[in-house]
Amino acid sequence: KNASPDDLKKAYRKAAIKNHPDKGGDPEKFKELAQAYDVLSDPEKREIYDQYGEDALKEGMGGGGGDHDPFDIFQSFFGGGGFGGGGSSRGRRQRRGEDVVHPLKVSLEELYNGTSKKLSLSRNVICSKCNGKGSKSGASMRCASCQGSGMKVSIRQLGPGMIQQMQHPCNDCKGTGEMINDKDRCPLCKGEKVVQEKKVLEVHVEKGMQNGQRITFPGEADEAPDTVTGDIVFVLQQKEHPKFQRKGDDLFYKHTLSLTEALCGFQFVLTHLDGRQLLIKSNPGEVVKPDQFKAINDEGMPMYQRPFMRGKLYIQFLVDFPDSLTPDQCKVIESVLPRSASSQLTDMEIDECEETTMHDVNIEEEMRRKQHQHAQEAYDEDDEGHGGGQRVQCAQQ
């Protein structure tokens, strides 16, 4: 408890050299030494340890060393060269920067044919004037407030034997762990170590790519000192098409026929996603039923990275029936089409039946109306039940 900072440094240096994994030492012992030094060399963490014990440091913020690389602490004493100038077998680990994700809207035509899009983006890059040091001299001071960790720990007493620990970036150094003298700040980046630049990226959307597919530009995200630069990622978002619908490598297309076309034959021109004109026609004597599907091989979407292979094009046929027919039209149709057995009823069978009257109905609206009616009735019944109870209570008073 009474050891001075210099005593701690000497003791750590001696034990760390002895137990370093590159010298055949025990990795776990080396890690424990780093954790102990990290706590004892930080006045704030040491106070927490003295008052509440090791568990208080581990709980919630990993202050017992879990957030600090033992090799980083070792290299703060000996530099990055390791032993004998040969370099450490492990080296200093760099934090990886965050990826930047952008949605990219594309049409179905662009996914079918492939396309390229040039996009202008702003990003942070290491300041070229100070090489990311933030100062003219290249020097910086360790933040006294957070002891260079970039983080502060606050403790709040919740009750007897209960504490809450919170870790937050240091306000003095903005989480960097370093302080730069105002007079020594880099004139270009103002001590921020990075500057903004405009970058134009050309995004290649290949044939057959899917909705939600990611296109990655490695190492093109924001740069930061001692950080492995993250990626810029574009996520494809397919816009809705007025005529075609895509399912995997297949395309679906709806076409409405008149009743005459459905019974007597049809032909029409379908404009595909690449502008080609496809002639679609029925076979002689073929009758198309409502909601019937037909398939055309190799006219679906190109398969990703196999552009000469395609899925299927499915055409769903809808049949538009006339609203009514004249008696003469009915006679003509009956003379051509076979009558169904159910329509050939005798007069005696008809006399024994009750006549009914049918009317047009929008079934979706009808079901919504009934659902609303049932909900209203249930609400009214519940309201009456509560009301009755209140009236009885008033009578007792």
Swiss-Prot record:
GO terms for biological process: protein folding. SMART domains: DnaJ. A lipid is attached at C394 (S-farnesyl cysteine). Keywords: Chaperone, Lipoprotein, Membrane, Metal-binding, Methylation, Prenylation, Repeat, Zinc, Zinc-finger. Residues 367-397 are annotated as: Disordered. CXXCXGXG motif repeats lie at residues 127-134, 143-150, 170-177, 186-193. It is found in: Membrane. The keyword Cell membrane does not apply. A zinc finger (CR-type) spans 114-198. The keyword Repeat applies. Residues 395-397 form a propeptide. The modification Cysteine methyl ester is found at C394. Residues 1-52 form the J domain. InterPro entries: DnaJ_C, DnaJ_domain, DnaJ_domain_CS, DNJA1/2-like, HSP40/DnaJ_pept-bd, HSP_DnaJ_Cys-rich_dom, HSP_DnaJ_Cys-rich_dom_sf, J_dom_sf. One of its GO terms (cellular component) is membrane. Plays a continuous role in plant development probably in the structural organization of compartments. This is DnaJ protein homolog 1. It comes from Allium porrum.
